[in-house]
Design a protein with these regions (language model features):
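Flexible hinge/capping segments at coil-to-helix
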Residues: 52-89, 174
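Secondary-structure junction motif
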Residues: 88-110, 179
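Short beta-strand-to-loop elements that line the ligand-binding cleft
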Residues: 18-26, 45-46, 113-123
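A ligand-binding cleft/hinge motif common to bilobed small-molecule-binding domains
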Residues: 28, 46-53, 100, 104, ...
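N-terminal winged-helix
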Residues: 1-15, 19-24, 28-32, 100-101, ...
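Short beta-strand-centered segments that line the small-molecule binding cleft or hinge
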Residues: 6-10, 21, 27-63, 67, ...
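A late-sequence structural motif
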Residues: 3, 155-179
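Short secondary-structure boundary segments
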Residues: 46-47, 69, 95, 141-144, ...
Length: 179
């Protein structure tokens, strides 16, 4: 949803005869549809480690922490990966590649398991709203932060080096190149 506005209008103007069907799917659905021939190509966080899928890296997108005002790290200008407690981070639900990226770079610093509740959402908007209610912090892909309102942008904290980022690639079946 954050990438489309950057190119879709120009693409449609330049290639008016191309039939373009755009769907927002989680990573598991993308892999399944690519493998069964119901999807020609997709853009997803990689690497996927899928033998039947070809990946062409498009860019690397940094993670940005969303830290609400009441949180202990709110007054920091930049944060470090070691500042994160995986048990305080509100995550996307299973099947989303961004969730897996967050879990991968936080796994070494996981403290104790969250005992009072566990939340997994399907949207970044829900995660932001819940963070604002004091239920934790969340991490966002950089492109998603560009559309936040000015008040929410004040709650963004960039990471010190090494900055966590995700690899984003064009993916398609190796067996048949349709693009």
């Amino acid at each position: 949803p954050t990438l489309l506005p950057m190119f879709l209008k120009n693409f449609i103007k330049k290639y008016p005869k191309v039939k373009l069907i755009i769907e927002e799917l989680n990573t598991d659905e993308i892999i399944q549809r690519l493998n069964n021939g119901h999807l020609d190509a997709a853009i997803a966080a990689t690497p996927l480690h899928e033998n039947k899928i070809k990946e062409i890296v498009l860019y690397f997108e940094p993670f940005v922490a969303y830290v609400p005002e009441h949180h202990q790290h709110y007054n920091k200008q930049e944060i470090e990966i070691s500042d994160l407690d995986i048990n305080e981070i509100l995550l996307l639900q299973d099947g989303h590649c961004f969730r897996e990226n967050v879990l991968n770079f936080c796994k070494n610093d996981a403290k104790s398991e969250r005992t009072h509740f566990q939340l997994e959402s399907g949207s970044f908007e829900t995660l932001i709203k819940l963070a604002n209610e004091g239920l934790g912090t969340t991490l966002l892909p950089y492109l998603h932060t560009l559309d936040l309102n000015e008040n929410d942008k004040l709650k963004l904290r960039h990471f010190k080096e090494p900055k966590p980022a995700r690899e984003v690639s064009l993916i398609f079946p190796k067996s048949e190149l349709k693009i």
